[in-house]
């Protein structure tokens, strides 16, 4: 083999080696790009999910539109109260069966859960202040009564959504048994806390005297 053939063969081998290195670099770049694309897609989906959850957390919640109490002729104290609850504007559906009611008076803080069955009051608004609806309330449970429930979600599953209105019955005579309910000039605070979203706030001070059986408290 003369010198010209040797140099020619060497250049050919060098060219093939360069081509192999180039192909390897292209493959590595392709794999890296694929990993970056997949990672980017995952992060984008994760960010979207997190953003949606954050929006629901901020927008969702309950609102207390009023609280009414009934004073007993026996103890002359408020033996049960009714809080009217509706979802906040823009709120997602909320499962009231998982909501906890926190109520505090006279150094006693009670935590109540929903009774397992809601009362359907949409066919004809029931007397939510009557004693007959107290059978499902106790010192540890409150009663949900649906007043507006277009899709029947409250009556079926105790799920409150847009346009719904419910009454929450609380037996304060049993919750605060030591005082046989809530007397005059008493400060009461509480909240109905759902699984997610803002709670419905209950806070009132009873009047100096109870001149009527039914008392508007909040």
Curated annotation (Swiss-Prot):
Cysteine pairs bridged by disulfides in the record: none
InterPro entries for this protein: Flagellin/pilin_N_arc (IPR013373), Flagellin_arc (IPR002774)
Post-translational modification: N-linked glycans consist of the 779 Da trisaccharide beta-ManNAc(Thr)-(1-4)-beta-GlcNAc3NAcA-(1-3)-beta-GlcNAc.
Domain of life, per lineage: Archaea
Propeptide section residues: 1-12
GO terms assigned for molecular function: structural molecule activity
Gene Ontology CC entries for this record: archaeal-type flagellum
Compartmental location: Archaeal flagellum
Keyword tags: Archaeal flagellum, Glycoprotein
BP GO terms, sorted: archaeal or bacterial-type flagellum-dependent cell motility
Glycosylation (residues): 38, 71, 77, 115, 136
Broad class of where this protein is predominantly found: other
Entry annotated with the keyword Cell division: no
Pfam families linked: Arch_flagellin (PF01917)
Protein family per UniProt: Belongs to the archaeal flagellin family.
NCBIfam families: arch_flag_Nterm (TIGR02537), PRK08541.1 (NF006325)
Biological role: Flagellin is the subunit protein which polymerizes to form the filaments of archaeal flagella.
PANTHER family: FLAGELLIN B1
Name of the protein in its database record: Flagellin B1
Source organism phylogeny: Archaea, Methanobacteriati, Methanobacteriota, Methanomada group, Methanococci
């Amino acid at each position: 083999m003369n010198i010209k053939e040797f140099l020619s063969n060497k250049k050919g081998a060098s060219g093939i080696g360069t081509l192999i290195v180039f192909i390897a670099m292209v493959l590595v770049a392709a794999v890296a790009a694929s990993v970056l694309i997949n990672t980017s897609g995952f992060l984008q989906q994760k960010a979207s999910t997190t953003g949606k959850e954050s929006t629901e957390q901020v927008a969702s919640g309950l609102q207390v539109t009023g609280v009414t109490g009934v004073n007993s002729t026996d103890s002359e104290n408020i033996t049960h109260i009714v809080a009217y609850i509706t979802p906040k504007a823009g709120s997602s559906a909320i499962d009231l069966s998982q909501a906890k009611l926190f109520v505090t008076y006279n150094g006693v803080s009670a935590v109540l859960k929903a009774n397992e069955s809601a009362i359907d009051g949409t066919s004809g608004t029931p007397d939510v202040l009557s004693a007959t609806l107290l059978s499902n309330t106790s010192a540890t449970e409150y009663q949900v009564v649906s007043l507006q429930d277009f899709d029947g979600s409250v009556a079926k599953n105790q799920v409150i959504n847009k346009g719904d209105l419910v009454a929450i019955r609380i037996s304060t005579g049993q919750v605060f048994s030591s005082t046989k309910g809530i007397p005059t000039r008493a400060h009461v605070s509480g909240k109905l806390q759902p699984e997610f979203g803002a709670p419905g706030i209950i806070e009132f001070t009873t009047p100096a005297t109870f001149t009527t059986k039914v008392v508007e408290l909040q």
